């Protein structure tokens, strides 16, 4: 069902799960985060920016075109569109994706975009049919999807939602009724040899001023990396 090769999907896996540690450390320095006593509230936003920008910068080498999706003034998401296969991938932390699937009629862009998947068969037995309000919401989604996709020069035939954690990467396809149609597990593509995202910000020494040579020679402890939702 998913035409895009595992090799290309592995790029998305690496972009999401294996962040650029050097970029994280540089961002921390830029906001003055040099010791554990300092705050770094922007870290989680920055981690997403690093993921998204990796897709923007290097996605073309793997067949992807980046699609910027604005969610008001507070958040910009990046979708990865494989133009040859006409597949649009949207990535989320797994808890966030679970929330999107659990509440499909809250107007999230992932739910709106998924109406292009049409009447795919539902793999789960539904206990309740859609009520009239939910059916009306789907009609609204179809109109909203035309506006959403119409902003870009793309014509996706499939929208694939990806959820990841530190040790897993899964892709799902829902039909236009927001029912689960397909699931795929790409966890085997995770390369655990990468540096893991630090759970705590490592201690970072401030940049040294080469002009100040007559300073104390007391050795500073070396910085340690302690390890690796929308």
Pin down the residues of each PLM region.
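A short acidic/basic microdomain associated with nuclease active sites
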Residues: 41, 59-88
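Glycine-rich, aromatic-bearing surface loops/beta-hairpins
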Residues: 145-230
């Amino acid at each position: 069902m998913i035409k895009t090769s595992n090799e290309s999907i592995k790029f998305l896996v690496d972009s999401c799960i294996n962040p650029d540690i050097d970029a994280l450390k540089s961002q921390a320095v830029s906001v003055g985060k040099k010791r554990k006593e300092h705050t770094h509230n922007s870290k989680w936003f920055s981690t997403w920016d690093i993921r998204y920008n990796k897709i923007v910068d290097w996605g073309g080498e793997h067949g992807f075109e980046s699609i910027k999706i604005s969610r008001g003034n507070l958040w910009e998401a990046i979708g990865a569109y494989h133009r040859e296969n006409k597949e649009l991938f949207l990535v989320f932390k797994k808890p966030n994706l679970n929330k999107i699937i659990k509440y499909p009629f809250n107007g999230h862009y992932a739910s709106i975009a998924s109406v292009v998947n049409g009447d795919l068969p539902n793999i789960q037995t539904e206990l309740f049919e859609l009520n009239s309000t939910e059916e009306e919401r789907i009609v609204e989604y179809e109109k909203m999807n035309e506006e959403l996709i119409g902003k870009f020069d793309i014509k996706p035939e499939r929208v694939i939602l990806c959820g990841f954690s530190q040790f897993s990467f899964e892709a799902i396809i829902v039909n236009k009724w927001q029912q689960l149609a397909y699931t795929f597990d790409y966890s085997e593509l995770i390369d655990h040899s990468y540096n893991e995202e630090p759970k705590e910000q490592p201690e970072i020494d401030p940049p040294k001023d080469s002009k100040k040579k007559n300073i104390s020679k007391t050795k500073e402890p070396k910085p340690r990396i302690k390890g690796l939702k929308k």
